[in-house]
Design a protein with these regions (language model features):
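ATP-dependent phospho-/nucleotidyl transfer catalytic cores
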Residues: 1-64, 75
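Hydrophobic core segments within long, regular secondary-structure runs in both alpha-
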Residues: 40, 44, 123-130, 184-191
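Active-site acidic catalytic loop and adjacent metal/ATP-binding pocket
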Residues: 47-95, 209-212
């Protein structure tokens, strides 16, 4: 299972407003119906874009499935280990790369101040992760994988937020409606930059001097 699951997502998000209503007041949920509709719409657009390239035909590997900074150990500012392999599975490799790029590039803050998290992402982090993958793999990312890279980031951003909120009404210690509105803000920042993401993750041209 991956975050690229249309049927599961549509079933869950159709119940999301009712779930939130069990945990939050009407005042807190003002406008949340529009937020949920926006998230559903953006997932649908992204999902269709991914399906158009033939998702199930993409190169498959064993993937971590839950790659984010919290599952990474550091020493002296360097990554020394990746942990938590509970979600290990066989899946199109691009799902892990795109989700990792999302998780490591997202600008965040304290859980008590989600309303003020920056909308933006670290573009250089996205670029560096793809370049590093290409450098150390026997099969660099295909053109079709690069084309859907931001669409998968969008899917992951939405699904990895909606699913846990549907289960408990919150995202960890953060109120569900607050977290969903933050995702909406980040999507509104990210969407106009989709083509730019595709551009920066392209492989360098042969003999190109990257510092020219």
């Amino acid at each position: 299972n991956t975050y690229h699951q249309g049927e599961v997502f549509y079933s869950v998000i159709s119940e999301l407003n009712d779930v939130l209503a069990q945990h939050e007041s009407k005042e807190d949920l003002e406008g949340i119906v529009d937020t949920i509709a926006f998230l559903r719409e953006q997932f649908e657009h992204a999902h269709k874009a991914v399906e158009r390239v033939g998702f199930t035909s993409l190169p498959t590997n064993i993937v971590h499935g839950d790659w984010h900074p919290g599952n990474t150990l550091y020493k002296d500012g360097e990554i020394i280990a990746v942990i938590d392999f509970d979600s290990l599975r066989l899946s199109p490799r691009i799902t892990d790369i795109a989700n990792g790029a999302l998780q490591f590039s997202m600008r965040m803050g304290s859980p008590e101040d989600v309303e003020n998290w920056p909308d933006s992402f670290r573009g250089h982090t996205i670029q560096s992760m793809v370049q590093a993958y290409d450098q150390f793999t026997k099969l660099p990312m295909m053109a079709s994988e690069r084309t859907i890279f931001p669409s998968l980031m969008i899917e992951a951003m939405i699904v990895e937020s909606v699913i846990p909120i549907h289960k408990t009404g919150s995202f960890g210690v953060v109120r569900g409606s607050t977290f969903l509105r933050m995702i909406e803000r980040k999507l509104n920042w990210f969407l106009p930059r989709v083509e730019r993401v595709i551009e920066v993750i392209q492989p360098p041209k042969r003999d190109e001097d990257s510092f020219a």
